[in-house]
């Protein structure tokens, strides 16, 4: 059964390190593109970012294995709140975990939209699985607003299917 915790740096650092090593390939690509201005971005930088005070960050664990991290910015950027979900490569092959995490993710999005008007982030143009999930929730992929192979997506409260 998946357990969800608000990230506590002292308690979860080693699990976040482990997740960095086992990220889905597409999530690794997105993290690297988002941080390409930092030439030596690595595991310690990832942990620092995931533990940042700028976001409400959570870690999802099953049997002491990090399955995912996710979060939402505490302050809006141009009226929108930045969100992220990053998963362990085990989600690519384990259907049971996949279904459970999707169900949980949908509930998280619903919760965020109850208090935030608009959510956003950039997603890699080849991240088809996540793009399908986002569009099923009512997100709009703005393929005309791109940066380094990443496309903007927005999810507005009134358009959501959660």
Task: Describe each region flagged by the PLM.
Residues 13, 18-41:
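Helix-loop element at the rim of GNAT/NAT acetyltransferase active sites that forms part
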Residues 1-18, 23, 162:
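Conserved N-terminal entry element of GNAT/NAT acetyltransferase domains
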Residues 94-111, 132, 136:
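Conserved acetyl-CoA-binding loop-helix of GNAT-fold acetyltransferases
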Residues 78-98:
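Conserved acetyl-CoA binding element of GNAT-fold acetyltransferases
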Residues 70-79, 143-145:
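A conserved beta-strand-loop-helix scaffold within acyl/acetyltransferase catalytic domains
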Residues 54-71:
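Conserved beta-hairpin
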Residues 113-135, 145-147:
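Conserved beta-strand-loop-alpha-helix junction that forms the acyl-donor binding cleft
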Residues 35-55:
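Active-site rim helix/loop that mediates acceptor-substrate recognition in acyltransferases
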């Amino acid at each position: 059964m998946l357990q969800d915790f608000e990230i506590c740096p002292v308690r979860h650092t080693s699990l976040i390190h482990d997740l960095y090593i086992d990220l889905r390939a597409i999530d690794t690509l997105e993290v690297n593109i988002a941080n390409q201005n930092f030439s030596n971005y690595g595991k310690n930088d990832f942990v620092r970012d995931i533990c940042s005070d700028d976001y409400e960050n959570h870690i999802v664990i099953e049997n002491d294995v990090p399955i995912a991290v996710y979060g939402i910015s505490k302050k809006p950027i141009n009226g929108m709140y930045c969100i992220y979900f990053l998963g362990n490569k085990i989600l690519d092959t384990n259907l049971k975990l996949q279904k459970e995490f999707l169900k949980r993710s949908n509930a998280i999005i619903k919760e965020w939209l109850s208090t935030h008007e608009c959510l956003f982030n950039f997603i890699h143009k080849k991240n088809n699985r996540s793009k399908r999930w986002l569009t099923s929730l009512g997100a709009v992929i703005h393929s005309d607003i791109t940066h380094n192979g990443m496309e903007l997506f927005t999810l507005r409260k009134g358009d959501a299917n959660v």
